[in-house]
Every structure is written in C-alpha cells, then in structure tokens.
A protein has these predicted regions:
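Extended, Lys/Arg-rich, non-catalytic nucleic-acid recognition/anchoring regions
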Residues: 1-296
Length: 296
C-alpha cells in the first residue's frame, strides 16, 4: 500500500458555487462599466450617443447583435419598424442541428421574412446570406460585414435573372469552408424566392481564367484553367467581386456583368473571386457535395 498522503476529494458543490459567484460578479462589473459608458455617451462629445459594442452571451445573440443594424431592418433608412428577431429561433436550431445546417436554415428563414416584409428580393437574399455566413464564422469575424460587398440580381444574355455575389478581400478570414458554403447558401436562397441560375458567357469564363494567371497573392490552391472553366460554367451563382489588385486584365478587360453598381467596368483583378473559387469551391468540394446530396 502506498505511503503517499491521501488526496482529499474535491468539494464539487463548493467549486460550482464559487464559479457561479465569480460569473455573477463579472456580470455586475460589466453592468457598472456599461452604465458609466452610457452616461459618458450622453454628453454628446463622441460620434454616436449609443455604445457601439453590444453585449452578447452566445452565438445566437452575437449573430443578431452583429447584423441587426442595418441588415435586419426592413427599412434601414426609416427605422419605422423593429428589426427581425432571430436570436431565439437560431438558438433553437443550434440545439437540434450542427452549425452548418443551422446556418442554412436560419438564412432561409431570414430571407423569407425579409422578402415578406419588403418585397425586395435582392435585400432579402443579402440579409439571409450575411446571417448564414455569420453563423458559419461564429459571429466573431468581419467576413459577414466586409467579406461580402454588393448582392445583385442581374440578367443573362437571354434576359433571365441570376444572382451575383461580390466577395471582397476580408472573406479570406472566413476560411475555405465558409467561403464555399456561402456560395451554396446563395444558391439555396435564390431558388427560394425565384431567381434563375447563372449562365456565364465565354468572355466571363475567360476573364476568371485570366485573373488567376495574374493573381500574385498567396493561395492554398490555384486551379488550372480547365478546372476554373468547369467551376465557373457549373456554378449557378455568379462569383463576382470588387477590384483588389493593381494589375489590369488585358485580354478580357471590359466584360458584361463584371461591372460596378454604377455600370463602370471592373478592369482589375478581383481577389475575392480568386479566394472563393481557389480556396473555397476547389478545396472544399467534397464538403459541398455532402451538403447538396443531403439537401437534395
């Protein structure tokens, strides 16, 4: 028998009580600090009179607080109606499903609610897509805010509509899985409210191939031209993006649908497109296939 002194059993109840007291004291101190900050803001010496950093307790709460202003308001200019409340529903979905499935389901729900409230399909998809991406990134990254630029409904050469999503440089922070699932969510949402699929033209396909040849930033995987052509042709959503690099395209400089909101051509390399296709759709294709097969 060992002569070492006997180790006393831990008093679990006491430890639980001490932990609860510690968390309660943290909450009390936070309330005090926020009260002081609110009084300071009321002086009108800062840019805004409200505290910019809201409190959030979990993923559902963080997602709502992150996107509430302006993306959950039916009319962000008028603010005559309260924003959509998604916290409780998202929390319920996260209890029943994995995070990726919950992201898709809450994105569909937000899109339908926003479309019913506004009748604006573009805004409905925009709000739903950002909510889905926020859930995928734990609502702690800038990707849902700055990683997506314009979400637009544009026209194919035959006049039919399609969805175009502008991906920007900060989408890199989301990682390949969230980038690829962002495209999948966009496809699901455009189907939900009756927007057609993207039918790329030869110049639009060749433009992406040219950009990969010019892109000099780090990529985990740079697809060859043949693979790029397959992805662009088969993707039902247009992976678009803002110009991020200094290099200008030469062969396919001015291409229909690769334009800014005001109609001017985007002639330089679009880094967000490279990231989403290279690190997202190419590297995470098996994961996307798993979700598409499960969702039929």
């Amino acid at each position: 028998m060992s002569n070492s002194p006997r180790i006393a059993e831990m008093d679990v109840n006491r430890l639980e009580s001490e932990r609860s007291s510690y968390y309660e004291s943290l909450d009390e101190r936070i309330e005090e600090v926020y009260a002081i900050a609110a009084k300071a803001k009321e002086q009108g010496l800062d840019f805004s009179k409200s505290i910019e950093i809201p409190r959030a307790s979990d993923l559902a709460s963080r997602t709502e607080k992150l996107l509430e202003d302006p993306y959950l308001f039916a009319d962000p200019m008028m603010r005559n109606r309260p924003p959509l409340k998604i916290e409780d529903k998202l929390r319920e979905l996260l209890q029943k499903h994995d995070r990726e499935t919950a992201a898709i389901m809450i994105a569909i729900s937000v899109t339908k609610e926003m479309h019913a409230a506004t009748g604006d399909r573009r805004r409905a998809i925009d709000s739903g897509l950002r909510v889905g991406l926020a859930v995928l990134t734990e609502a702690v990254l800038v990707a849902p805010l700055d990683g997506i630029g314009d979400v637009r409904i544009m026209n194919n050469t035959d006049g039919s509509e399609f969805l175009s999503i502008d991906f920007c440089g900060p989408i890199r922070a989301a990682g390949g899985t969230a980038q690829a699932l962002g495209v999948l969510i966009g496809d699901i949402l455009r189907r939900e409210i009756g927007v057609g699929r993207y039918l790329p033209t030869i110049p639009e396909v060749e433009r992406v191939k040219e950009e990969f040849g010019l892109y000099r930033a780090n990529l985990q995987y740079k697809p060859p031209p043949e693979e790029t052509e397959i992805i662009v042709n088969e993707c039902p959503v247009m992976i678009n993006g803002e110009e991020t690099e200094r290099m200008e395209c030469a062969g396919y400089k001015e291409v229909k649908n690769i334009v800014n909101e005001n109609g001017t051509f985007r002639t330089r390399v679009r880094g967000g497109v490279m990231l989403v296709i290279g690190e997202g759709l190419c590297l995470k294709a098996p994961k996307i296939q798993t979700h598409t097969e499960r969702l039929n």
